[in-house]
């Protein structure tokens, strides 16, 4: 059976920014509409893959956890072979896949996805790290296709200004889109889905 062309969506961001929570919400919202799968990257465990399975985000055979060992950004940039093999495996299992989400291991602001691994890149940062994060720059913040500023509900608790983050993000990204989000309440989720569907030419 001939496999259809597959959209690959990279999801990057620092540890704890909310990447796995975003994946879970995207799976729950889109799994009945699209044929989809997920590849997660963890340094020594399959924790993120297990989280998605436990939360019934997708059927178990649609999720593969890659143990990257050592440096997580090597697996998404310099040597993407493990991730490409995982995508191929999922595509063999599900020849009609519309897209696969590839979650990077927790990385720093300089990590980027190899073009052969990701057609569309989402980068997640979170407000709890402070409102200075957007102006620190780095490829994830300046060059990702969509920047997601997550956990806006904790802004007051950590003394972060969303206005400052909005201003600095516009300065760093120019015309590139970004969205403020709170995955607990699904705030911003509709905009993220619309971006994926539009830019990924799914609709």
UniProtKB/Swiss-Prot annotation:
Compartments reported by the entry: Cytoplasm
Gene Ontology CC terms: cytoplasm
InterPro entries found in the cross-reference section: CobW/HypB/UreG_nucleotide-bd (IPR003495), P-loop_NTPase (IPR027417), UreG (IPR004400)
UniProt entry keywords in alphabetical sequence: Chaperone, Cytoplasm, GTP-binding, Nickel insertion, Nucleotide-binding
GO molecular function, a single term: nickel cation binding
Residues engaged in binding GTP: 13-20
Domain of life: Bacteria
Entries under Pfam families matching the protein: cobW
Reported function: Facilitates the functional incorporation of the urease nickel metallocenter. This process requires GTP hydrolysis, probably effectuated by UreG.
NCBIfam families found in the cross-reference section: ureG (TIGR00101)
Family the UniProt entry places it in: Belongs to the SIMIBI class G3E GTPase family. UreG subfamily.
Name used for this protein in its record: Urease accessory protein UreG
GN (gene name): ureG
């Amino acid at each position: 059976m001939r496999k259809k062309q597959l959209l690959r969506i990279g999801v990057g961001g620092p540890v704890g920014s909310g990447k796995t929570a975003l994946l879970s919400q995207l799976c729950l919202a889109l799994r009945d509409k699209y044929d989809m799968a997920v590849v997660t990257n963890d340094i020594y465990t399959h924790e993120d893959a297990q989280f998605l399975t436990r939360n019934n985000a997708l059927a178990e055979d649609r999720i593969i956890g890659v143990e990257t060992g050592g440096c997580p950004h090597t697996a998404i940039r310099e040597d993407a072979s493990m991730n490409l093999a995982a995508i191929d495996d999922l595509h063999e299992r599900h020849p009609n896949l519309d897209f696969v989400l590839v979650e990077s291991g927790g990385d720093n602001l300089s990590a980027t996805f190899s073009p052969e691994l990701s057609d569309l890149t989402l980068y997640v940062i979170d407000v709890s790290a402070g409102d200075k994060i957007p102006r620190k720059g780095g490829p994830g913040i300046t060059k990702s296709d969509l920047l997601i500023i997550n956990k806006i509900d904790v802004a007051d608790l950590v003394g972060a200004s969303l206005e400052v983050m909005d201003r600095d993000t516009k300065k760093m990204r120019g015309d590139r889109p970004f969205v403020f989000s709170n995955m607990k309440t699904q705030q911003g989720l509709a905009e993220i889905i619309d971006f994926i569907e539009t830019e990924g030419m799914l609709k």
